[in-house]
Every structure is written in structure tokens, then in C-alpha cells.
């Protein structure tokens, strides 16, 4: 673990949190890292096998890590105990990657993205798959797309070319900008993050 990188998450100074948080292939498996302030214990549950792996707390501010013995990145979710006697199940936003098509970002950089409104702002979406292989349904309210194999959520994107970092905040994360830092998408100045329901 790179402690300097971890500190950039803790102090909200990283514009590419996906380079630290979420799943990463390493020697021996897949390293999963999360920043969950106030959590007492965290488990990773593989959706494929149903197996639970306890995460180690690597930093007193709320950084957790676990090594999943797997050759490839698989879908998973967190099971979190905040010490209030309840279990909270949460999907990892950093499992899904960028949802804006690369061509749309290239057009935006060139000043010819006439439909960028389709991506900027907050949009309910449904996704299937993980990482770079994710398929996005930008119209998840249609009856034909309400399928159990798709993850429902909201995709947030904003153009902030001079920002050091951008976060999604609200009641759902105690207005804590460290909990959902957005990812800088290439050289476009756009930051984005998909937050599953």
C-alpha cells in the first residue's frame, strides 16, 4: 500500500481516486481498497461465489483493504458494521469505471459535443458488467431495462477543468466529500462517478 496515496484520499486531494480505491489486479489476486470512515468492520462479499472476506483496517481514518484470491476482477459488495448493531450492504462505486463514451469526451474537448447534456449532471442509469466492460442503459426507467442482472444507480458528471478534486455529497454520505470523490476523465476537465443504489 502506498501511504502517500492513501493520505490523498483521507485529505481529499486526489483527482483519480479510482487509482487507489476499488479493485486492482496485483500479484496473488485482486486488491480491494475502500475508504469508509467510522466503519468498525468491513467484509467484501463476492457476488459470484458468495464468499465473505474480512477487510483489514489499514488506516485509523477509515481505509480498509482485502486481497481476493482471483485471477480476474469479479463483482462484489461491502458488508459494513458501523457499531450500531446493523449491517449495511453497499456496492463499490469504483467497480464500474467511466460511463461516458470516449467519443463523447473527445467531441467535448473539440468543442463539438452537442449532446453533452446527456452525460453532465445527475442521471439515473442501469449498468451491466464491471470496469471497462460495463454496458450502460441511459434510459433505465423503460420497462424493458428493469432486469435483475443490471445495477441501478445515478451517474454524476460535472465539468470542472481547474478543480483539484470534485466529490458527490448528500445526506446519503453525511455530506462528507471524502466518501465519494469523483474521477477525472482524461484531459476533458470532466469528473464523473456512478453511485449504485
Regions found by a protein language model. Name each.
Residues 1-38, 90-164:
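Non-catalytic, glycine-rich low-complexity segments
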Residues 23, 31-73, 79-98, 127, ...:
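Aromatic-rich carbohydrate-binding modules that target alpha-glucans
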